[in-house]
Amino acid sequence: MKRTMISIAALLTVTTGAMRAAHADEFAVGVQIPLTGALARVGMGTEEGIRVAVEVFNKTNGKHTIKLITVDDESSPAKAVAAVEKLASQNVVALTGGYGSNNIGPAADAANKLGLVYVSSGGVDDGLVNSGRTNFFRINNTAGYQKALVGLITDLGVKSVSVIYSTKEATTGLAKGIEATMKAKGIKVVTHAFDPAITDFKPVINKVKLQDKSEFIAMVGYENDYVGILRAARVLKPAIKGIAGVWSLATPKMAADFPDLMPNVYGTAVLPFPVAFTTPAGKAFADGYKKLYNKEPDYLGQFGYVQSLLLFEAIARAADKGTIKKGGVAEEMRKTDSMTLIGRVQFDPKGDNPNFTQRMGQHQGKQVVLVWPKEAANGK
């Protein structure tokens, strides 16, 4: 009799678990991201983090699961809009991804018209949060990057800087902010704007070498721009103390792909590479990354992970309240107050994260070593 009762109890437990699994809510989330074109490298890095977020969320939530539907926007604004519209037709409840403010802006407008939340870490142009989009959220911004780059240059005691920047919206805004801040600190600044289509940077570097004679070069652009500038600098050898860039530069991928160009180059980095995670949340991220990709994560993956996990948690809360189709995801995003791998994240009424700050890393061998600010540095 006891054996029969135990068997029945076990069967009930299994059946109950199966019923819960059968009734678990699965939500489709759209990923609009560049997987081809000029921004493919950064897009793929961000997407890796997004997929790790799904792995961790589905493993730990217990009640809801997320399914991704991904569309390559081919690094094109028009294709980004088309991607959002296609994903909306496939009944996604929200969107994560995007890279490049000029791509994200039109895509976010499309999402806003469709009533879909759009979260990103790929666009820092302040126009993204100053244009009345009620469903747009981002975890990083220009102010955090500007503070880090200017902080490094100031602490290095640099007296003169040449700022080389792309004429795209986000890069122009950041470059102008950097210029104004450094001039206010008494640093001599010369700026050189370039068209995004340019590939030969030797004329610009020649001006830096012969006319500016600056001690330092600050690059504000994207991966392909950095590679072109660094190649030109390697050929012409201007007498500079250092060269730094912002996003998409201080990554192990760049070190692996361009080992001749990266030594001693500075770039923004949330964490050093490799990194030892000590918190449960950090370990869950690292373990998920190792499982899916069998490699160490970089900051692009960290950003993609953080933005997406916050979104998935907001979706889950809205689902619990039955408000998914009533604007609940946006409402829950606005209530976000979470300690994450990039620090505390909250969203102000415009969808911006006022707590965001960056750090500066330097390529040293196969490592990315944090060198600014001093309290976060793990090397010199």
Where are these regions (language model features)?
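Extracytoplasmic "Venus flytrap"
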Residues: 30-51, 71-78, 99-102, 164-172, ...
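Beta-alpha junction/loop-to-helix N-cap segments that form part of ligand/metal-binding clefts
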Residues: 26, 42-46, 56-130, 195-201, ...
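Extracellular/periplasmic Venus flytrap/periplasmic-binding protein
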Residues: 82, 126-127, 133-236, 274-284
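Segments of small-molecule ligand-sensing domains
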Residues: 291-301, 312-368
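Short, solvent-exposed amphipathic alpha-helices that sit
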Residues: 42-59, 79, 145-148, 169-187, ...
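Extracellular/periplasmic periplasmic-binding protein-like sensory domains
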Residues: 230-305, 319, 373-378
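Periplasmic-binding protein-like
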Residues: 87-99, 119-121, 162-165, 212-223, ...
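C-terminal segment of classical bacterial N-terminal signal peptides
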Residues: 14-22
